[in-house]
Amino acid sequence: MQALVNKIWYQGHPLRWLLLPLSWLFAVITYVRRALFRLGIKSQTAMPVPVIVVGNITVGGSGKTPTVIYLIELLRQHGFTPGVISRGYGVDIQGVKTVNLGASAAEVGDEPAMIVARTQVPMVVGAKRVDAANALIAEFGVDVIICDDGLQHYALGRDIELVVIDGQRGLGNGLLLPAGPLREGAWRLDAVDFIVNNGGPAAKGQFEMQLAPTEVKPVKCDVTSGEYSFDKSQPLVAMAGIGNPARFFESLRAQGYQLALCQGFDDHQAYDKTLLRDLAQDLPLLMTEKDAVKCRDFAQENWWYLAVNAKLSPQFDEQLLARLREVAAAKQGNFHGIR
């Protein structure tokens, strides 16, 4: 099914025309919904600290999580105490839940588990971002909130909107769901503060981001530094349960890894030992960092993951920090109208 969807959204499959009436209906619904917030008919809750929303206007992964991690580290380096909120995709969370270090993906979602494992940032997940934001402030006293994937969650007031675009796939066929991958029309990009192009090249007004691979590490938690080595010249099986698995596989090939088999899974895929053991067939198994947090409890010795770090320009850092300081100085907890 996902293969057919990709053909419709990114390869010009003619089925998109049959779905176009549904896309028109979706466009009306999204426009009316946003208008209700802009007109004040539906309420938007402002936070007493600056809120940075990191999202996209397309379905699927675009590089939001590496961007969130980059922002966490950038803000810490400049004296801020950031915290993160998220929906916790694929997890049924009643109310809100604090993401503790070591929390499983089954409890809080794969991306929250990965973000906290990497950064130890204060983080709260919940279906209602406003409740999660209030809990984050009350429990941790953060001075900046980063909302991971909440661009269309207009009930939460925001001060800075940052959209991440997949530089390879772009906006696909440019159509709204279900005929295309768009959650909102391309016009929405004109209203955000920052557009980050993952993989570039960046268009005018955008900031290019590259994902730089780090060292390969074992998925199995009890294998400590210095007790392992990875030979990238050996044949291996690569797997990825992310929005665009092909990007991960292409990156591995470019780095010289010998891929005997590439297996893409749906984003947020749940795994079990039998599925992956049968896939690997005794060959080393190399996966993404997001996949690794879901496999630690049953990982074998020859299962590995490759983390990536986002790289952005000093100009991006300067402009975002300047905007954030401006917001922080003026913040009085009053309503911030949606733009």
Swiss-Prot record:
Function: Transfers the gamma-phosphate of ATP to the 4'-position of a tetraacyldisaccharide 1-phosphate intermediate (termed DS-1-P) to form tetraacyldisaccharide 1,4'-bis-phosphate (lipid IVA).
Organism in which the protein naturally occurs: Shewanella baltica (strain OS155 / ATCC BAA-1091)
InterPro entries xrefs: LpxK, P-loop_NTPase
GO cellular component: plasma membrane
Catalytic activity as recorded in UniProt: a lipid A disaccharide + ATP = a lipid IVA + ADP + H(+)
Enzyme Commission identifier(s): 2.7.1.130
SUPFAM superfamilies, A to Z: P-loop containing nucleoside triphosphate hydrolases
Pathway listed: Glycolipid biosynthesis; lipid IV(A) biosynthesis; lipid IV(A) from (3R)-3-hydroxytetradecanoyl-[acyl-carrier-protein] and UDP-N-acetyl-alpha-D-glucosamine: step 6/6
Binding site for ATP: T58, V59, G60, G61, S62, G63, K64, T65
HAMAP family xref list: LpxK
Keywords in alphabetical order: ATP-binding, Kinase, Lipid A biosynthesis, Lipid biosynthesis, Lipid metabolism, Nucleotide-binding, Transferase
Pfam families reported for this sequence: LpxK
Gene Ontology molecular function terms on file: ATP binding; tetraacyldisaccharide 4'-kinase activity
One annotated GO biological process: lipopolysaccharide core region biosynthetic process
Keyword Nucleotide-binding: yes
The protein's name in its UniProt record: Tetraacyldisaccharide 4'-kinase
Similarity annotation: Belongs to the LpxK family.
